[in-house]
Amino acid sequence: MKIAACDFDGTLFRDGAVSGADLEAIAVWRRSGNAFGIVTGRGRNTLLRDVERFNIPYDFLICNNGAMICDEQAQDVYCAVLPEAVRAGIMDHPGMRASSQCAFFAGTSIFTHAGKTDYWIVKDHILPRLSPAEALHLPGLHQISLAYAEPGESAAWSEAFTEGCGESAGVHFSNICIDITAPDVSKAAGMEHLLHLRRWGEAEDVLVIGDDMNDLPMIRHFNGYAVANAAPDVRAASSAVFPSVGQMLRERG
């Protein structure tokens, strides 16, 4: 059996859609006895919204940059909680004040910062709100996500958070967003946890593919791939570049 995992936004989900060719390739891959899943910075519920819309079949979901793992029924089987001391530092950081949006992911729930927008990225999905004090003690909080006006701003704040948090947290940068998790959380670590949980350590091959900076750890760890529209650093780190997820599955199946 082979295992394939792809990033979602910019990799499988491009230009607001998932292509029919990619969906067919995923179906053929799974009919051949292989496993397929998604590894994303999104939370479970925001991911499922589009997974269900496009009827994407899957055997696992790795969400929030590896902080949460879900099975084939979208039930969570692993979660790395963000320590309260780290949360406090993030709440007081200038990068928090500079962000235009903020979301708190806890278990399978998502909340927004009471002092910012009442949505996360998608304006027509209104979410419940929390004050920073409530988020500080929220059970199961495993990711704080911040959004900025443009990628250059988020890149600069990502460096500031990385310097400020040191080894106490994981800082993941992708486009206009920064996601902050417990230390040692990454898409690579999430994949390793998955392989252990599902007892897939003897899999014939593990294929991963992505497009942005938060995909680099898993691409480097698994000698993985990039899609053609990936960031230059991601393409440079990959062992091959494919035009789509489906093409990777067809060629490596």
Task: Show where each model-derived region lies.
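Active-site phosphate-binding/coordination module
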Residues: 20-118
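Residue-level signal for inorganic ion chemistry
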Residues: 29, 65, 144, 219, ...
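Hydrophobic/aromatic beta-strand patches that form the interior of the parallel beta-sheet core
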Residues: 37, 62, 207-209, 225, ...
